[in-house]
Amino acid sequence: MKHIPRFYVPDEISDQISLQISPRQMFHATKVLRLKEGDKVRIFNGTSGEWECAIKNIKKNIVTSLELIRKPRKEPGPNIACALINPTKFSIMVEKITELGVQNIYPVVTEYTQYKTFNRQKIEQIIVQACEQSKRLTIPTIHDVINLEKFLGKFSKDQKLLVGVEKENTTGNIECLNQNDMFLVGPEGGFSDREVDMFNAEKSVSTFYFGRNILRSETAAIAFIAFWIAKYI
């Protein structure tokens, strides 16, 4: 039995219409998986569920929708903010937390952040491919880069920001995580003393001690998402 690949398309999907997939997607289907015209693929757009389609025209990258096989549904997942880190490591982090079900990703600039921007086109492609691979129906949002001080102003008593720090004198505990709380991952150099003091002064921010082991930023992000899943899924 041939493997049936899943592909994301940005277009609206309905019954018995022609859709154009990307050259990359058609190459994977026909050159890697050796599919031919008439063979089946699966398509999703983040809002309309998952559809079984048939390859119609390989040269023009056209498929035809046949049947809705997974209805649209909400996919609960956490939100995370992360200081920008080395582009390769940032890409790995985004890929893994997307597979785990993150809903929103907020890139943040802190005092020790060495990188101020990210390659949006590349990151969005990584997100799409991670959703295709993990059988997600929804696509997480990668937001614009924001300064840490401005980011802290987004929170209220109804939503808290949890920050993992390397010091033991903290104001909270990750066990107190609520479903709509957000986690902030620090940069490769950690947070400055001024930033930690700023966290401790904010009522909407809780710091917690991640343990004796010093985690890489991408590891901390994955660990938090895994903890959220264990508690709420």
Task: Give, region by region, the residue ranges found by the protein language model.
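Structured adenosyl-cofactor binding patch, chiefly the S-adenosyl-L-methionine
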Residues: 193-233
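Short, ordered loop/turn segments at secondary-structure junctions
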Residues: 12, 68-69, 110-113, 212
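N-terminal positively charged helical leader segments and presequences
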Residues: 1-71
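Glycine/charged-rich beta-loop-alpha catalytic/anionic-binding loops adjacent to active sites
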Residues: 19-21, 75-79, 180-182, 202-210
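RNA substrate-binding interface of SAM-dependent RNA methyltransferases
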Residues: 71-160
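Active-site/ligand-binding-proximal alpha/beta "capping" segment
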Residues: 155, 159-198, 204-208
